[in-house]
Amino acid sequence: MESVLQKIDDLEMKLSFQDISIEELNQEVIKLNALVARQQQQMLLMVNKLHSIEPSNMASSAEETPPPHY
């Protein structure tokens, strides 16, 4: 009978450790989701800034002087 009680205690201990591990992993997932969301916002801002650059400020490929080796 004692071995059954010992096995139950072992299982309860393992379950407790698993609960702690799951909660820690969940917190990491939450942090990473927030980080990804911030990075997506920053990327969107960068894309919008690139789209807002006036084409007149950039020379076309026809206007570019060729490199010296041509």
Curated annotation (Swiss-Prot):
Disulfide bonds: none annotated. This is Protein SlyX homolog. InterPro entries: SlyX. Belongs to the SlyX family.
